[in-house]
UniProtKB/Swiss-Prot annotation:
Taxonomic source organism: Pyrococcus woesei
GO cellular-component term (any): ribonucleoprotein complex
The entry's keywords: Ribonucleoprotein, Ribosomal protein
Protein's name according to its UniProt entry: Large ribosomal subunit protein eL33
Higher taxonomy: Archaea, Methanobacteriati, Methanobacteriota, Thermococci, Thermococcales
Gene3D superfamilies on file: translation elongation factor selb, chain A, domain 4 (2.40.10.190)
Any single GO BP term: translation
Length: 87
């Protein structure tokens, strides 16, 4: 069973940005409890050229169901707002 999600942002602070950690909002997940069940699952993003970048959900972000995913390589800026597949 796979779930679609939207890439919201990089994990960042006022002065630093972590390019290989993304904040993702899974569709139809609206609480921290539902999001915590996704920890450890694989995240796939397909680039416009067809390359597939893999990541893993490492923790929940906030209380509205967003999660943090750590990728092998950092995602490019064109991934922001794009869909990912959570397997």
């Amino acid at each position: 069973m796979s779930i679609k999600g939207v890439v919201l942002s990089y994990r960042r602070s006022k002065e630093n940005q972590h390019n290989n950690v993304m904040i993702i909002k899974p569709l139809d997940v609206n609480s921290r409890e539902e999001a915590s069940k996704l920890i450890g699952r694989l995240v796939l993003w397909k680039s416009p050229s067809g390359k597939i970048l893999k990541g893993k959900i490492v923790r929940v972000h906030g209380t509205k169901g967003a999660v943090r995913a750590r990728f092998e390589k950092g995602l490019p800026g064109q991934a922001l707002g794009d869909y990912v597949e959570i397997v």
